[in-house]
Amino acid sequence: MNSPASLSGESISESHGHVLVPGELDLSHGVALYLEDINVSFDGFKAINHLSLSIDAGELRCIIGPNGAGKTTMMDVITGKTRPDSGTAFFGQTMDLTRMREPEIAHAGIGRKFQKPTVFEQHSVFDNLELALKTNKGIWSSLFSRLSGEQSDRIDELLELIRLQDLRDRPAGLLAHGQKQWLEIGMLLAQEPKLLLLDEPVAGMTDAETERTAELFVSLAGKHSLVVVEHDMEFVNSIARKVTVLHEGSVLAEGGMSDVQNDPRVIEVYLGR
């Protein structure tokens, strides 16, 4: 299988060993993320073993698998935190993730949310979104620049999207757990990512919060590509058209939720039935 760059005949430019992020993400072939034959070892342990998968532009994909299956390491490779021993990782057609650093990958349009929410608890919901919106301008600009009308409108849109418009002035530290998760998702969205990586986003949520989160993710698909790592099978079933099952660092099965649930290999190693 040819990588996106070889298919398009394009490459990432370099300058003195420093990778230059292309100005525009190329999704012309309809693929947002492309991993092929990725391998990662830690002290002899094979965390990722010949892993290959692709995520279409605008797709909402759920990743499931037992502990130690390689889910976190896979996201570390995508975000540049971990360098693979071998393999290919492309964002769109031209961005070779294996040759980019973490800040470059984030700037290129890949946003990651960890399981535990990290918000500025002493600041209001609105201020958290404002800081996220200005983050690319540098710390001094973020602290002292005034919001433009367009930026204020964008924050209002985000507040409505994450359903926190009535709590805009509340300190983030006083929010419920689920509300903090939504706020952090809003902060990610403020940076206009094309690909969102979401690690167990509904862990610790109430049933009502989980349902709201499902609605949010479904509404984001299309404009954004989403990769959701989750253990809550009911939640996965409510949002996923396609599920990838990881086991021992490789793709064990892939398809619709019903197909995956009835796959004998998945039943044996993961679902326990």
Predicted regions located by residue number:
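Glycine-rich phosphate-binding loops of nucleotide-dependent enzymes
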Residues: 7-273
